[in-house]
Amino acid sequence: MSIQAFVFCGKGSNLAPFTQPDFPFQTQNKDSTAATSGDKLNELVNSALDSTVINEFMQHSTRLPKALLPIGNRPMIEYVLDWCDQADFKEISVVAPVDEIELIESGLTSFLSLRKQQFELIYKALSNSNHSHHLQDPKKINFIPSKANSTGESLQKELLPRINGDFVILPCDFVTDIPPQVLVDQFRNRDDNNLAMTIYYKNSLDSSIDKKQQQKQKQQQFFTVYSENEDSERQPILLDVYSQRDVTKTKYLQIRSHLLWNYPNLTVSTKLLNSFIYFCSFELCQLLKLGPQSMSRQASFKDPFTGNQQQQNPPTTDDDEDRNHDDDDDYKPSATSIQPTYFKKKNDLILDPINCNKSLSKVFRDLSRRSWQHSKPREPIGIFILPNETLFIRANNLNAYMDANRFVLKIKSQTMFTKNIQIQSAAIGADAIVDPKCQISAHSNVKMSVLGTQANIGSRCRVAGSLLFPGVHLGDEVILENCIIGPMAKIGSKCKLSNCYIEGHYVVEPKNNFKGETLANVYLDEDEEDELIYDDSVIAGESEIAEETDSDDRSDEDSDDSEYTDEYEYEDDGLFER
């Protein structure tokens, strides 16, 4: 089964002040006016199309695209692309906003070059062995710019023409130890009438770094309604999703009586998190198409004069063509075709209108509601909950971002021949990742931390459980505990920071103590810069004014804070309570 993979790169609304939706990349040169993001980006991309473009961009900008935020000194999207290479997908495409796609492509240049060299080494090693028939070239990675305002709109208007078979939608921010074959096999074994399979997981990490972040995560919980179908041979299916805010507003969880009538043994969970991984069948494209194609499909589905229902024949894949000729004695299937689903049958889709001008999480919520809202059942959406023994992290908020880095550090500390390192009387723990270009002065201590390139650590510093972006400068006797320091930031001597987030290019004056604060730059209308201490809710854009706008639709794939309070769209069959 050949599957196309689409990796969505969002803005990262919950990763501020290191990245934030609709935040213009500003330069830090006070002698001139701030350059626009497009001009500066084009200048850097055209001047250096390699990995150094990121470091050079950090010297002028305070924030980065989310896909290029480092996890273990590697852009987070590289872990997703490595995972896709293990799955052997038919095609890999990276979808990002049009103002970030060039920088993301440039930031992955060194990764793509190394990836090609690795495949060449494997080719040389296996060319003379009995496994030469397994040799293949690395899948090309396409970069697709998106001008859509939401991920659902991007899928409907920009990606549907590129899809020619089953496909999977992935985020750019997950780190996991689950082999992709586990999810692919689960998708292959889905029920005949399932249009897609969503992946959910339980948060197994007990992070206690930032209490404010934990409180925000509790407010952003969701009530996930699903059925395990224990009394039948069917696979579990997703039924509905409700937001914590909506339930709090109405003071009770409202579940439709029609849903309870069809699924009396449903389960409601607040511990499940959406992974933003959707394995979709090609039949789903028939529901999501719009415009003249949708009108023609609706016309062919029902005769306006006679009212007779007519058979809808959606485009078929190669495997479907082989199954269609099972009764043909003269038909000879291809010798190389693999047909793991011999008894699959096509679904007679009822082409209900689907509104895709929203995030994909809402689109699949509407598709799950579609399966039971109508008097005639529709095709359901499957759900697969990852086992507790596995580890899955989505770095879509600051707490999870730190957990992802600690997961990589834990793997590094457990590898063989790993030991503590002494550099000029400075102690570097086995659970730390330090770039070779870092400068660490005497009597400093680094434990369970990640230090980016060209970081400068003063003498007698103590860095524990922290993440330092490239170009960070620490004075003497600085203490950092569970902090994230943005690129080119400067921390004065004898400062003590605990559970703090420092934006890039920010300067902390000497002898300051902060705990649980977010320090960010503020750009005034006159292009003047000032420095203030912001509360996390202000930085993350969770003010009441921001909630009333639709500016965060594009970043819904980055977080699970999108609202699920849209009105129901259903066929009035008289079974709903009023």
UniProtKB/Swiss-Prot annotation:
It is found in: Cytoplasm, Cytosol. Residues 544-578 have a biased composition (Acidic residues). GO terms for molecular function: translation initiation factor activity. The keyword Cytoplasm applies. The keyword Coiled coil does not apply. Residues 298-337, 535-578 are annotated as: Disordered. GO terms for biological process: cytoplasmic translational initiation; negative regulation of cellular response to amino acid starvation; regulation of translational initiation. Gene3D superfamilies: Hexapeptide repeat proteins, Spore Coat Polysaccharide Biosynthesis Protein SpsA, Chain A. Keywords: Cytoplasm, Initiation factor, Phosphoprotein, Protein biosynthesis, Translation regulation. It holds the Pfam family Hexapep_GlmU. The modification Phosphothreonine is found at T306. InterPro entries: eIF2B_gamma, GlmU/GlgC-like_hexapep, Nucleotide-diphossugar_trans, Trimer_LpxA-like_sf. GO terms for cellular component: cytosol; eukaryotic translation initiation factor 2B complex; guanyl-nucleotide exchange factor complex. The modification Phosphoserine is found at S296, S300. Present with 9530 molecules/cell in log phase SD medium. Belongs to the eIF-2B gamma/epsilon subunits family. Acts as a component of the translation initiation factor 2B (eIF2B) complex, which catalyzes the exchange of GDP for GTP on the eukaryotic initiation factor 2 (eIF2) complex gamma subunit. Its guanine nucleotide exchange factor activity is repressed when bound to eIF2 complex phosphorylated on the alpha subunit, thereby limiting the amount of methionyl-initiator methionine tRNA available to the ribosome and consequently global translation is repressed. Component of the translation initiation factor 2B (eIF2B) complex which is a heterodecamer of two sets of five different subunits: alpha, beta, gamma, delta and epsilon. Subunits alpha, beta and delta comprise a regulatory subcomplex and subunits epsilon and gamma comprise a catalytic subcomplex. Within the complex, the hexameric regulatory complex resides at the center, with the two heterodimeric catalytic subcomplexes bound on opposite sides. This is Translation initiation factor eIF2B subunit gamma. It comes from Saccharomyces cerevisiae (strain ATCC 204508 / S288c) (Baker's yeast).
